[in-house]
């Protein structure tokens, strides 16, 4: 010890004394621990003292004080360590024990949050120590040093032993009775401090990782409650059996200890080692998840499903009335049960269901809407589970719309199923027997409410419904308070707080999220008040996100505003701009999720916007469309495909995930931003048929600028196109002739110039050109030109092409020219069944003929046979004047054009020129001022 200058003694232990010393060689303070003089002659204790030093020296971890030097050549033996200024955990605990009031500084140091952070560091250290095969055996507040700079280190390794090593029986023999009344580490048969020993350790069983975990449990109990788990006087014998440890929540309710942490402590202090944590790693993960706010669930309520007291409402309902998308009988009666329990915005529900219950279908609503008792319970989120033919299907429902579905075959003959539903941190998750089935992200504030179920028979719920509360985070989100105000429709109060948070955290997630929610708040207020000025303020609020770290949210917010205002062109523009400009932005997935939801919403309503959102989803998230949804979409589009010329002329199947589907959707919606990419894709693949179809659609939609650019590209590259020996349906020469014919139509040249110069074209290309020419000629009141064009190509197309694709144009021309005799001859060739088939345009043309020869009443009587369940594009005029009428917002852009063309001809046949000319004007305006 000659090398060190001893300053003062700073501590004493069972075998050693610790001094503050100065090392002049290294110019630093050190802690020097030497064996007590009265024990220095005992070789066994000397070996134990040196073993402590070597164990500490072998452990390299921030939570273990490293050893600088070990001196064992002659007495006194000692070792040196860094000197850490601080105090023990015991000192800190003693400073607050039995005190009624604490200073602000001390209250912060001993808060649950501060202590839990320290305990997590302790767990990390012991996890490392156990990984090295070492047991501490004497974990207690005395042996935990808290440094002035947030260090938390484990002291006193004198009792440490390697896992599985036999207990060292020292020469000091202490009776069991003396051990049980001692608070000191006894260098005898039982090593450690009895108050921190597990029950099995007190009975003489060897130490284990589980006994260290028990000791940590006693430490954590004191940290949480500021009291000891055993209520006994000093010196009183510890009772090994039958002593109940009260939970931390019971002992210190004023400390607001989360139920989850209370459960963690009680698990650590379980009498049976098998019921404790299996490792410190498992314990540390639970503590980490709590600190991070990850969900760890604690059972708060067990709801007996068969007791009437569990439910605020339990009434029979017709399921189809509220969930028409579900595959159930219209007369299926179920029970709607709404709980008495108010759920939290973060919660977990557990149900044990019989197979019979799932065969009949089971619904979960979380939470029900404000108007649940008034029959409006289906607003919000819910899950529907149903087994059919050994396949379990789970549907996620939002505002009565199925937005997600997952199906899986059941391999075993299970008779019971554990269903769990979690709502946590923007996500809704459903688990079946521990397996994740569905996860949905919702980025608007969650709210609390009542839990509801829909079930055929309560007997199918086999056990109590478990309602679990999330452990939550010790750091409550600053958004929680304004979120609560928003959920309660206290818009002004929510807005003030959101703006304050946004200004306080510029550039941080909390800040931009608050700014976005401020916009949502203004939007909700505007919708409630139906105030146009407030909608403008919502746009202004979202604009504050411009070019910031969450720029995509500006456009998502604006899209929501335009949706409420029914300004759908602006809504789509906002979404497109964000998708294009911020395709790689971390927040863009929120916007993509919204686009997918808008598809589900508009498709369920059979709204015309479904076609537009289908285009977007097929580009950004095609996997979001399930096989079941794909089947329904294709069925819905089938009638439109039968009225689409390029689908009729192309025998290939129209598949959902295909370039042809994108073109088809563009044609019917009039939404063409993707037309350019479709062109380049087909051009790169030399797919001439696809190029012809694209040019046909562009010409029909009057997209002359696009066509002009395509013609320029074609002219530039025509010389590079080499002839191929492979026989192809269309050559690039055909494509060129087709393009120039389209250009002639645009220039409004006569039929002879268009068709005579292209007399070598195939029948398919002639049909395309004739269709475009005839539609233009009719709307320009040039019915005679249709006859001229027909004469030029009649001999160049097969007879079936004439009947399938040209005859209707010929009938229109006769109607325009009022050729009653010719029309009579034509219609005599059709049966009454054919003339009344509303799937074909002949149905409408015959109605126009009746209007021409008999008047409006005869035509409307003919139109009155339309079906109620379907609307066919070919017979829109008939449905418009039918008693059923056309549903609002149902007609796509192309259908509105088609209807105006049909009405234009119909009013001409009636001799109502004013209405006819109005339809003509509206048709041209619709083309010029495109509206989704």
Swiss-Prot record:
Residue intervals of the Protein kinase domain: 4-291
Presence of the UniProt keyword Phosphoprotein in the record: yes
SUPFAM superfamilies, alphabetized: Protein kinase-like (PK-like)
Positions of the catalytic residues: 138 (proton acceptor)
Catalysis performed (reactions): L-seryl-[protein] + ATP = O-phospho-L-seryl-[protein] + ADP + H(+); L-threonyl-[protein] + ATP = O-phospho-L-threonyl-[protein] + ADP + H(+)
First-tier enzyme category under EC: transferase
EC number: 2.7.11.1
Keywords in alphabetical order: ATP-binding, Kinase, Nucleotide-binding, Phosphoprotein, Serine/threonine-protein kinase, Transferase
GO molecular function: ATP binding; protein serine kinase activity; protein serine/threonine kinase activity
Its biological purpose: Together with the serine/threonine kinase Pkn1, may play a role in the specific interactions with host proteins during intracellular growth.
Protein family according to the UniProt entry: Belongs to the protein kinase superfamily. Ser/Thr protein kinase family.
Protein's name according to its UniProt entry: Serine/threonine-protein kinase PknD
Provenance organism: Chlamydia pneumoniae
Phylogenetic classification of the source organism: Bacteria, Pseudomonadati, Chlamydiota, Chlamydiia, Chlamydiales
Gene encoding the protein: pknD
């Amino acid at each position: 010890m000659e090398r060190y200058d001893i300053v003062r003694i700073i501590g004493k232990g069972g075998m050693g004394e610790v001094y503050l010393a100065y090392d002049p060689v290294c110019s630093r303070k050190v802690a020097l621990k030497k064996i007590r003089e009265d024990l220095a002659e005992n070789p066994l204790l000397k070996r134990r003292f040196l073993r402590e030093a070597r164990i500490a020296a072998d452990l390299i971890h921030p939570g273990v004080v490293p050893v600088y030097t070990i001196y064992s050549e002659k007495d006194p033996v000692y070792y040196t360590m860094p000197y850490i200024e601080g105090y023990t955990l015991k000192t800190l605990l003693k400073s607050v024990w039995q005190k009624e009031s604490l200073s602000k500084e001390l209250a912060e140091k001993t808060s649950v949050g501060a202590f839990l952070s320290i305990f997590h560091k302790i767990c990390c250290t012991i996890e490392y120590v156990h990984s090295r095969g070492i047991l501490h055996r004497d974990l207690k507040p005395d042996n935990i040093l808290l440094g002035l700079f947030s260090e938390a280190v484990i002291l006193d390794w004198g009792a440490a032993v390697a896992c599985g090593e036999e207990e060292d029986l020292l020469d000091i023999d202490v009776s069991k009775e003396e051990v049980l009344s001692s608070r000191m580490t006894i260098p005898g048969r039982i090593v450690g401090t009895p108050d921190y020993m597990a029950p099995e350790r007190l009975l003489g069983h060897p130490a284990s990782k589980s006994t260290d975990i028990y000791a940590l449990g006693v430490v954590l109990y004191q940290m949480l409650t500021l009291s000891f788990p055993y209520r006994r006087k000093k010196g009183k014998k510890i009772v090994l059996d039958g002593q109940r440890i009260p939970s931390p929540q019971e002992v210190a309710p004023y400390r607001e200890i989360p139920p989850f942490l209370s459960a963690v402590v009680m698990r650590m202090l379980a009498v049976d080692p098998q019921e404790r944590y299996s490792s410190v790693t498992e314990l540390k993960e639970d503590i980490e998840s709590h600190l991070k706010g990850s969900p760890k669930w604690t059972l708060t309520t067990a709801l007996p499903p068969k007791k009437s007291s569990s439910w605020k409402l339990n009434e029979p309902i017709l399921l189809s009335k509220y969930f028409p998308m579900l595959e159930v009988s219209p007369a299926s009666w179920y029970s709607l049960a709404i709980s008495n329990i108010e759920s939290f915005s973060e919660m977990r529900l557990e149900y044990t269901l019989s197979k019979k219950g799932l065969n009949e279908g089971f619904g979960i609503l979380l939470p029900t809407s404000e108007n649940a008792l008034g029959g409006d319970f289906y607003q919000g989120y819910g899950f529907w589970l149903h087994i059919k033919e050994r396949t379990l299907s789970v549907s996620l429902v939002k505002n009565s719309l199925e937005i997600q579905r997952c199906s899986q075959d059941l391999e075993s003959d299970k008779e019971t199923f554990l269903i769990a539903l979690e709502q946590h941190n923007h996500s809704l998750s459903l688990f079946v027997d521990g397996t994740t089935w569905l996860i949905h992200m919702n980025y608007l504030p969650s709210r609390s409410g009542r839990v509801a179920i829909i079930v055929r028979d309560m007997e199918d719920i086999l056990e109590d419904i478990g309602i679990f509360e999330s452990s939550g985070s010790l750091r409550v989100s600053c958004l929680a308070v304004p979120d609560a105000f928003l959920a309660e429709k206290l818009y002004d109060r929510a807005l003030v707080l959101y703006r304050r948070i946004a200004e306080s955290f510029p550039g941080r997630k909390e800040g931009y999220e608050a700014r976005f929610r401020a916009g949502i708040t203004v939007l909700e207020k505007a919708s409630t008040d139906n105030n146009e000025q407030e909608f403008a303020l919502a746009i202004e609020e979202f604009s504050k996100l411009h070019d910031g770290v969450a720029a995509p949210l500006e456009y998502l917010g604006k899209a929501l505003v335009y949706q409420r205002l029914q300004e759908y062109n602006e809504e789509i523009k906002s979404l497109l701009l964000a998708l294009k400009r911020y395709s790689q932005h971390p927040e863009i997935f929120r916007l993509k999720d919204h686009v997918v939801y808008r598809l589900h919403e508009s498709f369920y309503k059979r709204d015309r916007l479904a076609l537009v959102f289908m285009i977007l989803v097929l580009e950004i998230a095609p996997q979001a469309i399930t096989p079941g949804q794909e089947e329904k979409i294709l069925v819905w589009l089938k009638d439109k495909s039968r009225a689409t010329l390029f689908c009729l002329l192309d025998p290939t199947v129209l598949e959902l995930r295909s370039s042809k589907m994108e073109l088809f959707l563009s044609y019917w919606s009039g939404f063409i931003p993707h037309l350019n990419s479709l062109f380049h894709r087909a051009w790169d693949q030399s797919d001439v048929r696809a190029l012809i179809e694209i040019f046909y659609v562009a010409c029909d939609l009057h997209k002359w600028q696009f066509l002009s650019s395509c013609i320029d590209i074609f002219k530039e590259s025509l010389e590079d196109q080499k002839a191929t020996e492979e026989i192809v349906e269309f050559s690039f020469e055909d494509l060129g002739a087709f393009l120039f014919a389209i250009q002639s139509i645009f220039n409004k040249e006569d039929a002879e110039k268009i068709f005579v110069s292209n007399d070598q074209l195939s029948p398919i290309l002639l049909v395309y050109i004739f269709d475009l020419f005839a539609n233009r000629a009719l709307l320009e009141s040039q019915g005679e030109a249709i006859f001229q064009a027909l004469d030029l190509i009649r001999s160049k197309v097969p007879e079936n092409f004439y009947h399938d694709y040209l005859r209707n144009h010929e009938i229109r021309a006769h109607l325009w020219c009022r050729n009653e005799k010719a029309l009579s001859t034509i219609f005599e060739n059709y049966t009454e069944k054919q003339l009344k088939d509303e799937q074909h345009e002949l149905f409408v043309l015959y109605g126009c003929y009746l209007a021409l020869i008999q008047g409006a009443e005869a035509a409307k009587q003919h139109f009155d046979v339309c079906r109620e369940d379907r609307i066919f594009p070919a017979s829109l005029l008939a449905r418009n004047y039918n008693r059923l009428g056309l549903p609002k917002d149902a007609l796509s852009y192309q259908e509105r054009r088609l209807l105006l063309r049909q009405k234009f001809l119909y009013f001409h046949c009636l001799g109502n020129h004013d209405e006819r000319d109005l339809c003509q004007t509206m048709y041209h305006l619709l083309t010029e001022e495109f509206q989704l």
